[in-house]
Amino acid sequence: VSKVTWKSEPDPHDYPAAASYLSLIATTDQINDLIEQLKAAPLSHYKAKDMLRASGLRLLPQDNPHVAADVTKVKNNKALSPVLLIRGDLAHGITLQIADGYHRVCASYHLDENTDIPCRITNHPHNAAR
């Protein structure tokens, strides 16, 4: 099994990609706040299996072109970018949002579900006032 290596910081284009996804579920003001919070957040680590469980997303198959591309990167010893997460809220039924990096999470899971994935994570806007 190939070991996943990770970059120390998200790629610059990960933030606009996260904003694009978030534009489907959040207001422009919320998106701007979330992106700034993600940029300022320290790196944390969570397991691939836990990210998928908390997000409620299904594991994409290994033959998904984007997942396969990330698996190939790992096998070629290329580092993957940390993922960007918005923390869910269990009490309100809000799941974790993988704002950027879903395919990387799936690729990592296929290689080892216990992979510790570096991420930047911030609270859901619903929790920000608490």
Placement of each model-derived feature along the sequence:
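Short alpha-helix boundary/capping and kink motifs at helix termini
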Residues: L38-Q97, Y109-H110
